[in-house]
């Protein structure tokens, strides 16, 4: 591991090194691409500004599945319930209360241009960018664009990180650096097994 035949270039220009491995982007089943790159904060703010949200007193936290408020109380925002099996592996079943949508029915009644928060999380990156472009949500697009740029346009915004491959996890990590923007300092990215799942 770590062997190479030659390393050349102007090393004096490199100010820091980023090691990108294939470890999952989050340990929680609630972790997903859109939360990792911080775009979900802007999406939640968008829904909190809707007229129905203001009437009902909903804040951005009501559109989070990590805290109490708007998430389904039965599955705690997981969208599924684990059933313990005595002699077999546990079985994960869709939550009967929310139908796997992770939020309370009342929260799902809040829509932005006809789409509720579950509809947004079910969109692919490509579809979400097109949707937000149609409605001029530049700030959200700027954060989603790097995911498309690294070839993850097919992934759903709310797809659990546990279902992503090692190569996909690497791409999301790379996208998160791109979201932060270009700086004057030069960085060297070192990828763990870059030929595994990570090619453009």
Describe each model-derived feature in a short phrase.
Residues 1-200:
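Conserved phosphate-binding elements of NTP-dependent enzyme cores
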């Amino acid at each position: 591991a770590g062997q190479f035949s030659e390393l050349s270039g102007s090393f004096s220009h490199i100010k820091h090194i980023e090691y990108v491995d294939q470890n999952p982007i989050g340990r929680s089943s609630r972790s997903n691409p859109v939360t990792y790159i911080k775009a979900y904060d802007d999406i939640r703010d968008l829904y909190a500004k809707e007229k129905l949200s203001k009437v009902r007193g909903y804040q951005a936290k009501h559109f989070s599945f990590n805290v109490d408020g708007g998430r389904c109380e039965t599955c705690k925002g997981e969208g599924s319930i684990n059933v313990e099996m005595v002699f077999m592996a546990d079985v994960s079943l869709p939550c009967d209360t929310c139908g796997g949508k992770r939020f309370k029915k009342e929260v799902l009644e809040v829509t932005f241009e006809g789409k509720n928060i579950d509809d947004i999380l079910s969109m692919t990156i490509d579809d979400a960018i097109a949707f937000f472009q149609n409605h001029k949500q530049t700030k959200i697009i700027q954060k989603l664009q790097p995911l498309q740029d690294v070839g993850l346009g097919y992934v759903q915004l709310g797809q659990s990180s546990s279902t992503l491959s090692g190569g996909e996890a690497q791409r999301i990590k790379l996208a998160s650096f791109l979201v932060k923007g270009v700086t004057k300092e030069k960085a060297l990215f070192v990828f763990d097994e870059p030929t595994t799942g990570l090619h453009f």
